[in-house]
Amino acid sequence: IAGLLDHAGELFDCSAAEETTLEANPDDLTPEYLAALRRAGIDRLSIGVQSFDDACLKLMNRRHDAAQALQAVRSAQAEGYGNITVDLIFGVPGFGGDSLRRTLDTALGLNVQHISAYHLTIEPDTAFGRRAARGEFAPVNEAVSEAEYALVHETLTGAGFEHYEVSNFALPGFRARHNASYWHGAKYLGIGPAAHSFDGRERHWNVSSVEDYLAGAAAETETLTDRDRFNEYVMTRLRTAEGIGLAETE
């Protein structure tokens, strides 16, 4: 990771970079790895906790358990990370109500600066999706989804977090800078297999195969019309607390 960041600094002017985020699973964040990441220049961690309920984690086939998730956050804080976000999942069949409330309370008790809460999506061609197709569990209905989303919103905003985007909550001053760029139509460069980029007019996405990517396979490209860009502006900005600026649509 240090080599990648150093090479990026050789190719691009990164002097204005205000935040360098790394996403990781809890079971990967050993004290040694956390220290190495700090030395490499990582100053923000996004930790894929998903839940602090072991039964819920088992249902979702996660490698880690709740104890590992807690330890990952505490180890990161001990290493000096002062900008940590945890990803949580709601809408998991059988794990709303008290289970979700305990997960939210546990996350708040860790004094992290940012929390992302996403509704579970069951993809058909996954192990989880195949289990649902066999009738092992059923997706939650719309009423349950709404109730759980309301619980997430009320709990986190009640604790002082800003609900600044559909799925994202931050303490003042800790909004995710890279995500905000996507929602506001900024340009970005994606490097690696399956990575997406946007140059202001065209979207590019790399092949997903590592072998094909290393062999130099060309990225696919979509050129956006003015109508496409307007529609994307509306859709992405409606995800944010700021909403749409009418002057910007003219």
Residue ranges and their predicted role:
Residues 1-250:
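C-terminal scaffold of the Radical SAM
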